Amino acid sequence: MRSGFFSILTLAALLCATSGARAESGFWIDVPYVAQQKDGCGAAVVSMVMQYWQRQQGHAASASAEPETIFRALYSRSAHGIYSSAMERYLQQNGFRTLAFSGQWQDFARELQKGRPLIVALKPDSSSSLHYAVVAGVDPDRQLVLLNDPARRKLLKEGRAEFERDWKATHNWTLLAVPQPPAQAH
């Protein structure tokens, strides 16, 4: 009986360790890709993160994780998109803990190795509006970040210098969202 328990623990540890894939010199996790509609990058990234966690928990994507549902609930005409505070609130209302912070390059490897994708805000040039993407991978040796960019494609490779320039324009805004632990019975 005791050896069966340790076998289960060993199997669980292996499964946790393989939630991401090791690239040649980097690390990435398989976050579902959602393409955006016009002004819908915020809805698309929230959808990607929600679908990722629902899949990790063995659930099908819920209606609340559909990008159209998110877009209708959160779109602001004045912003021509979705405010970051609205994304946080939506995630919290749908069972997630959120933490918005000014990120650093090393945060990516640490969180991705824990199986946690990150949402980032980017500003590609001084005249453009904000754009949201999901950091799904990082390759520190080649100085690359792998983005699920809802306007472009899944696992878009971007050089660190270009990425950090666009990210710095948003004060390195980063959002971590993880599922709330199930309520414990007393």
Regions found by a protein language model. Name each.
Residues 1-4:
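Positively charged n-region of N-terminal signal peptides that target proteins for export
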Residues 6-7, 28:
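Compositionally biased, low-structure terminal segments
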Residues 7-17:
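Bacterial N-terminal signal peptides
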Residues 23-32, 64-185:
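Conserved active-site-adjacent core of cysteine acyl-enzyme catalytic domains
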Residues 29-59:
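N-terminal targeting signals for Sec/Tat export/insertion, comprising classic cleavable signal peptides
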